[in-house]
Amino acid sequence: MLSWLLVFSILVLLAQGVSSWENPQTDQVSEGLQQLFGNISQLFEKGILGRDDVFTMVSREEWGAEAIGCSSKLSRPVDVLVIHHIPGLECHNKTVCSQKLRELQAYHIHNSWCDVAYNFLVGDDGRVYEGVGWNVQGSHDQGYKNISLGVAFFGTQEGHSPSPVALSAMKGLISYAVKKGHLSSKYIQPLLAKSEDCLVPPQKGKQKKACPHIVPRSVWGARDSHCSRMTLPAKYAIILHTAGRTCSQPDECRLLVRDLQSFFMNRLNACDIGYNFLVGQDGGVYEGVGWNNQGSKTDSYNDISLSITFMGTFTGSPPNAAALEAAQDLIRCAVVKGYLTPNYLLMGHSDVSNTLSPGQALYNIIKTWPHFKH
């Protein structure tokens, strides 16, 4: 069975005075698409979606594209397929969909991109529209554009999932891409990309800070230590849990981090606490050994990975929303600051060591995060 890496994101296109697709109801559409695509492998297995579904390709010339201005080439086959959904460009026939694509291309070029952001676009009319094509990098996703094909659904009625003919066209396009060697059939792992991970301008007033507040070692009362240095930028972000008590208040969390450091140094004879950063149920991020020093909990990955541990046990129930958001913000921060490579891989502790960490409930969540690799 062919294995697919599907990255799903809601692409929010924002510019004043262009058209109604500037202010989509992203939450509603996102949830629907996540549910729709979550079982895509099962649809293949059950025969609901055939591997050889035919599709009609509309060339750039046919839909009236401006001359392409992109020059960065893709090396084939790529390992990643990034599927987006563009809300607000409703169309159900070739004429209207072509007009919407011309508007979209003009918007992207106006925002200093070299062309329309995607390799291909699938209209709700069931046609596949050529974007920058098979051999050129799109601008659809900062972390994947040089190793992926970016394909976007467009034309759907706001609040609805793509039509059956659009889904069939998408499946046909994917099958064709694999058969022709444009897309690798190697399995990696499904993951979920948020809109802020794309290259699209975020909505005003909703842009996240580059980094969360990190409680420094001096504030939680760390002991001095001298650990081996990291090899930066790290290639991996590894998620763990401490498998002990948790904390929901800053003073509790500071005490817990101190106790954990003492356990590592006194009982395990480690150079310091075993993690680069720790996350509490108070939504706080606590500096462990920090950006530049190695942790001691990820075996042969210590020097090339950032270890982020949730304080507590998360086998049955996951961390709360504040803690999960803090960890995701920290990962984004690491990329922005250059401590983590943009093409990093995210893994659970159990993926690199014989352990139950980070707990099944937490693991089920992180495997939907960007860059996850089992």
UniProtKB/Swiss-Prot annotation:
Its main location: secreted. GO terms for molecular function: N-acetylmuramoyl-L-alanine amidase activity; peptidoglycan binding; zinc ion binding. It is found in: Secreted. Keywords: Antibiotic, Antimicrobial, Disulfide bond, Glycoprotein, Immunity, Innate immunity, Repeat, Secreted, Signal. The keyword Secreted applies. Ubiquitous. Disulfide bonds join 211-333, 227-271, 247-253. Peptidoglycan binds at residue 275. Residues 294-303, 354-355 are annotated as: Interaction with murein. GO terms for biological process: biological process involved in interaction with host; defense response to bacterium; innate immune response; negative regulation of natural killer cell differentiation involved in immune response; negative regulation of type II interferon production; peptidoglycan catabolic process. InterPro entries: Amidase/PGRP_sf (IPR036505), Amidase_domain (IPR002502), PGRP (IPR015510), PGRP_domain_met/bac (IPR006619). GO terms for cellular component: extracellular region. Glycans are attached at residues 39, 93, 146. Residues 76-212, 233-359 form the N-acetylmuramoyl-L-alanine amidase domain. Residues 1-20 form the signal peptide. Homodimer; disulfide-linked. Heterodimer with PGLYRP3; disulfide-linked. Belongs to the N-acetylmuramoyl-L-alanine amidase 2 family. Pattern receptor that binds to murein peptidoglycans (PGN) of Gram-positive bacteria. Has bactericidal activity towards Gram-positive bacteria. May kill Gram-positive bacteria by interfering with peptidoglycan biosynthesis. Also binds to Gram-negative bacteria, and has bacteriostatic activity towards Gram-negative bacteria. Plays a role in innate immunity. This is Peptidoglycan recognition protein 4. It comes from Mus musculus. The lineage of its organism: Eukaryota, Metazoa, Chordata, Craniata, Vertebrata.
